[in-house]
A protein has these predicted regions:
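Short, charged recognition helix plus adjacent turn
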Residues: 93-97
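Conserved beta-strand core positions
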Residues: 35, 52-54, 82
């Protein structure tokens, strides 16, 4: 059984990279692929109260149930609040910055 992350802080980028195979398998179980980290964790500036910003691709459009189930499964595994967004769901004014800073978990 995998040890849970400290609930007082989001996992570091290095921790997420070590967990990448598990995280990508989890995303695939809900129809997602290509998980990428952006935001404060990707920039190395996460604080104890920060959430974890993840970008995920879905071939086609995920159902609300698929999307929420993946979000909740990631939160349960990592024991941290996850802000999960899809590429298609990114607001146009944020898309370029987020895609530029997003770090693949592969």
């Amino acid at each position: 059984m995998m040890e849970r992350m400290n609930p007082q802080r989001p996992p570091s980028l290095d921790e997420l990279k070590r967990l990448a195979p598990t995280l990508q398998s989890l995303a695939a179980a809900y129809g997602g692929r290509e998980l990428r980290v952006f935001g404060s964790v990707a920039r190395g500036g996460a604080q104890p109260a920060s959430d974890l910003d993840l970008l995920v691709d879905f071939p086609g459009s995920p159902s609300l149930e698929q999307f929420m189930d993946l979000k909740l499964a990631l939160e349960d595994l990592l024991n941290v609040r996850v802000d999960l967004v899809t590429r298609k769901g990114l607001r146009a004014e944020l898309r370029e910055r987020i895609e530029r800073e997003a770090v693949p978990l592969a």
